[in-house]
Every structure is written in structure tokens, then in C-alpha cells.
Amino acid sequence: MNLSEFLAFAATRRPLDTEEIGRFMDEMSDSARRITFELNGSYHTPDEVRALLSRLFGYEIDPSVRVFPPFYTDFGRNIAVGKGVFINACCHFQDHGGVTLGDGCQIGHNVVFATLDHGIAPAERRKIGRASCRERV
């Protein structure tokens, strides 16, 4: 499975419960952890932070974006960040289902974006799927 296939499948909102999807999510999580450990492990200039986040997100983020580490994600490749975005310290992005921050968006300390959901009963917890929410404007 590749990133495009995963994102297309996740958009269908069907459970992410196949072995192939599980392996892919594990690989992406490992890659994201490597970069976030590097980001969060020592001081970096704002330009260095943006460079590390660009590696993590898979595209070059705008120079106007400002992020105060530590920053956490368990996927990294389904985050879209517009111009002039500010993300304060200790934010968590579970972005398998997608997180989009439009131009000028400001995120405070300790915010959690959880875009996956699973059943409450133990037998249903392996059936991970995209979380449902209503968009607020």
C-alpha cells in the first residue's frame, strides 16, 4: 500500500482493519516518530522547525508558519497547513483521517486532533475508522 491508496481508502470511512493497512500505518508511524523525536529532542531555529515539519508532512510549508515544539503526530502525511498558521507547544495530531489548518489559523497549547475512532467493546477495538465530526465555520 502507498500513501495515495491509504488516503483514498481512509476517505471512504470504512474500517482501517486489514493487515496491509495495519502494516502501512505502522511504517508511517515509525517514520513520523523518527522525525518528531528529532524535532522535539533539542532546540531548533524557526527555519529548522519548518524544514523538519516539511519532511514530516511531505511538502514544503510556507515560511510564515510558526510552530513551537514539542509537536506530536503518529502519521504526519495527512496534515495540510496554510499560510500564517501558528501552532503552540504540546499539540497532538492523529492525522490519519486528515487535519486541515487554513490560512491564519492559530492553535493553542495542548490541543489534540483525533481523526480516528474505534468501537468501545474489546472485540470492536481493532476496527479503526475515520472519526465523524461536523465542520465548524
What positions do the PLM features span?
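Terminal amphipathic alpha-helical/low-complexity segments used for targeting or macromolecular assembly
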Residues: 1-64
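Flexible, glycine/small-residue-enriched loop-and-beta-strand segment within the central core
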Residues: 71-81, 86-136
